């Protein structure tokens, strides 16, 4: 153990070395100087040096990093460069302006509308959807167990709450859980997957409960991101895409590889386009990941079984890790469309694929009929993951301790809802059916009304909870937008917000083919408000077109 004086001498030696680097010949007054300046203070005492030498020495040492420059430690210039590349259009400038307008309305500022209609995000409860009764009953019981003695709650809700609480430390949902998630919840998730996929086995040890699906997606991308230059990981994402993917890829320093969905064929996925995209990317990175969103966000398409088989074959042939974002798996509306999980199709294709293709699939409490976005519940299942990598995954999630316990509890209710014969089953089924039926009607309504507007073309909303119509913009509008440094559809959507109070997300925030323009809107508002919004949008588009023609 060095004495304090020895440490001071050692530190001063480093300062002397910094000075020597700046001045080849060290003056005698430096070498013979005594006593030593105080080095325990962040501000070195150079008062004993002649003024010129003191100023010069501090400047040189600051340049060499021995003394920090004055001012902020963290600035835009010194922050993580990857963070500056992150963009998330769903909560971008238009949404920020919508929040300002809401404040202005509350302050009495006159607008040509009375409210802001936020159709920019898939937040069902914010749009007025009522929570599922059974879910909220159990969550109330879990968060305030004294209610277990209240006869207002049905017995199946009480039994479910007791089971969850017994799996929590101290019988409290406020306790930390195991990092991979509450054991009984992971077991229920595995059973749900087996039922969904026709009996194909699911191992609870392959289930990781997550803070929404987003957390799981980012975690898997972290594992996959590696290399530099030509070896840097490339991640294939659909265009249009959900901005979580492009934002995460930018933050992690991976390479975004775009493949385009076919708008003329209801946003279908063509294997030839995947091949084109892959071959082009291999010239500048190492493509390792293929991301699929099914049903689609923002485009609302539902992939056929044949398409999924083709994608799996492509991934196997090109040695790609598959990520299947399946958070809208209950949101299928169009006749002839059906949700097929990637895992089910993978295993039904036989051991040639089921033993080889690496797959991570994701689900959430935020979408489908539940709409419980704020609880941040979700899970991921990993298939064919290398055992050593899986150990690293478990380590990685352990760093964050655990997902929110209430979100885990809600995920349990989603995968294990009231069963036939239980007191809450009938009400649960009525509420679930009502939500999904209303969404199906609104999907059709949105398509029908938008397609009556000259200059707007909307593909069928087969699933999920968004439409992504194409808009034709006059050249004058495009020129004015570019003069303002805005994407033309951003210009359009900002005008729409200011004149009507309707908040949409421009297609440029999701990616689109050059020369095309779109916007994404959710179908979640109540039917009467959705009709009002669509008609206001129709009138605005006609005015906008006339104004700039």
Swiss-Prot record:
The gene is gpt2l. The lineage of its organism: Eukaryota, Metazoa, Chordata, Craniata, Vertebrata. One of its GO terms (molecular function) is L-alanine:2-oxoglutarate aminotransferase activity. It is an enzyme of class 2 (transferase). This is Alanine aminotransferase 2-like. Signal peptide: none annotated. The keyword Chloroplast does not apply. Pathway: Amino-acid degradation; L-alanine degradation via transaminase pathway; pyruvate from L-alanine: step 1/1. The modification N6-(pyridoxal phosphate)lysine is found at residue 367. It comes from the Eukaryota. Belongs to the class-I pyridoxal-phosphate-dependent aminotransferase family. Alanine aminotransferase subfamily. Its EC number is 2.6.1.2.
């Amino acid at each position: 153990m060095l004495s304090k004086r020895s440490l001071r001498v050692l530190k001063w030696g480093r300062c002397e070395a910094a000075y020597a680097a700046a001045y080849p010949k060290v003056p005698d007054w430096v070498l013979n100087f005594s006593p030593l300046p105080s080095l325990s203070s962040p501000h070195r005492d150079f008062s004993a040096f002649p003024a010129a030498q003191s100023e010069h020495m501090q400047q040189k040492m600051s340049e060499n990093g021995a003394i920090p420059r004055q001012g902020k430690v963290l600035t835009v210039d010194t922050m993580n460069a990857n963070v500056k590349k992150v963009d998330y259009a769903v909560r971008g400038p238009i949404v920020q302006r919508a929040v300002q307008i809401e404040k202005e309305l509350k302050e009495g500022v006159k607008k040509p509308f009375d409210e802001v209609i936020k159709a920019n995000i898939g937040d069902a409860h914010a749009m007025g959807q009522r929570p599922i009764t059974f879910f909220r009953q159990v969550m109330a019981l879990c968060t305030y167990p004294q209610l277990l003695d209240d006869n207002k709650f049905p017995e199946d809700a009480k039994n479910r709450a007791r089971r969850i609480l017994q799996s929590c430390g101290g019988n409290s949902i406020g306790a930390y859980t195991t990092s991979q998630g509450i054991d009984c919840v992971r077991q229920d998730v595995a059973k749900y997957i087996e039922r969904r996929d026709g009996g194909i086995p699911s191992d609870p040890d392959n289930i990781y409960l997550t803070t929404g699906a987003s957390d799981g997606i980012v975690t898997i991308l972290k594992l996959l991101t590696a290399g530099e230059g030509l070896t840097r990981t490339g991640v294939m994402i659909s265009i249009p895409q959900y901005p979580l993917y492009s934002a995460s890829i930018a933050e992690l320093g991976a390479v975004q590889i775009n493949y385009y969905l076919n708008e003329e064929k209801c946003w279908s996925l063509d294997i030839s386009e995947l091949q084109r995209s892959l071959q082009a990317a291999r010239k500048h990175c190492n493509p390792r990941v293929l991301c699929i969103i099914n049903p689609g966000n923002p485009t609302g398409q539902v992939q056929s079984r044949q398409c999924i088989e083709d994608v799996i074959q492509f991934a196997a042939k090109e040695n790609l890790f598959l990520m299947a974002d399946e958070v809208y798996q209950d949101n299928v509306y169009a006749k002839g469309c059906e949700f097929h999980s990637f895992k089910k199709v993978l295993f039904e294709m036989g051991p040639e694929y089921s033993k080889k293709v690496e797959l991570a699939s994701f689900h959430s409490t935020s979408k489908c009929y539940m709409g419980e976005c704020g609880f941040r519940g979700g899970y991921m299942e990993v298939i064919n993951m290398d055992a050593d990598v899986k150990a690293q995954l478990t380590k990685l999630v352990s760093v964050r301790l655990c997902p929110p316990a209430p979100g885990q509890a809600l995920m349990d209710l989603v995968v294990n809802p009231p069963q036939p014969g239980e007191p809450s089953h009938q009400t649960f089924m009525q509420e679930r059916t009502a939500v999904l039926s209303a969404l199906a009607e609104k999907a059709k309504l949105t398509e029908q009304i938008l397609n009556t507007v000259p200059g707007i073309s909307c593909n069928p909303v087969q699933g999920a909870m968004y439409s992504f119509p194409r808009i034709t913009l006059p050249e004058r509008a495009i020129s004015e937008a570019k003069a303002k440094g805005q994407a033309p559809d951003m210009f359009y959507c900002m005008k729409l917000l200011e004149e009507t109070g309707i908040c949409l997300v421009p297609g440029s925030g999701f990616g689109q083919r050059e020369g095309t323009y779109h916007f994404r809107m959710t179908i979640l508002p109540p039917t009467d408000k959705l009709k009002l919004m669509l008609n206001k949008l129709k009138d605005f588009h006609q005015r906008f077109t006339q104004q700039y023609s």
